[in-house]
Amino acid sequence: MKILVVCSGGLDSVSLADKMAAEHELIGLISFDYGQRHKKELDFAALAAKRLGVPHQIIDMTNIGASLTGSALTDDLDVPDGHYAEETMKITVVPNRNAIMLAIAFGVAAAKKADAVALAVHGGDHFIYPDCRPGFIDAFQIMQAHALEGYADVKLLAPFVTVSKADIVTEGAKYGTPFDQTWSCYKGGARHCGRCGTCVERREAFHLAGVTDPTDYEDPDFWVSATSGFQAREV
């Protein structure tokens, strides 16, 4: 199958790109600039595309992102520290983000005669993000079948949707993903902060997978206290 991967430049989507390149015909990576404070992630998506020898397209959604207010990822709000599953992390929701991005990705995929769009949502996303859950994935596929009926048959692949981030680390290691060439931190500083929800989840995932974490964190040990009382699991 010819696959277009939605790639932010993060650990999950870069690992997915490597998996798709190994198992199918990867025709390109598509990324989105929606005004996120951690825009440097897009540089890591570009690195992945160059390494894999495929085109990389960045869709400018900054005008749209400016209207999706109330998120710490796009507004002048503090990104909270702590575990990814805490209620405080809801401030990182960008409303309807995946639905908007996927609608664009499906249009691009149809135009490029791709067979599928691949997305790296995973079980750990379910706590906070409704557009990362299996129900959303299934419903979006049905909607797109109607939207492209008679024009194109594009599938939505979400192979990580029911597994943990630790499982993604295992998959990435299997396919040789250079984890030091991925970006997760929502704060978008010079180094991974080690304290925001996505840094904590990243650090925990390497630990649970038994894979060496090459990431340079400002606070490499915060994850231990942040994850106490939580149990990473498949959802």
From Swiss-Prot:
Cofactor note: Binds 1 zinc ion per subunit.
A GO term, aspect molecular function: ligase activity, forming carbon-nitrogen bonds
Catalytic activity, reaction form: 7-carboxy-7-deazaguanine + NH4(+) + ATP = 7-cyano-7-deazaguanine + ADP + phosphate + H2O + H(+)
Protein name: 7-cyano-7-deazaguanine synthase
Biological role: Catalyzes the ATP-dependent conversion of 7-carboxy-7-deazaguanine (CDG) to 7-cyano-7-deazaguanine (preQ(0)).
InterPro entries in the record: QueC (IPR018317), Rossmann-like_a/b/a_fold (IPR014729)
Coiled-coil segments on the chain, per record: none
Known pathway: Purine metabolism; 7-cyano-7-deazaguanine biosynthesis
Entry keyword Metal-binding: yes
Chain positions recorded as Zn(2+) binding sites: 185, 193, 196, 199
Keywords: ATP-binding, Ligase, Metal-binding, Nucleotide-binding, Queuosine biosynthesis, Zinc
Cofactor(s) of this protein: Zn(2+)
Family label: Belongs to the QueC family.
Gene Ontology terms describing biological process: queuosine biosynthetic process
Record EC number: 6.3.4.20
Annotated positions binding ATP: 7-17
Top-rank lineage group of the source organism: Bacteria
SUPFAM superfamilies: Adenine nucleotide alpha hydrolases-like (SSF52402)
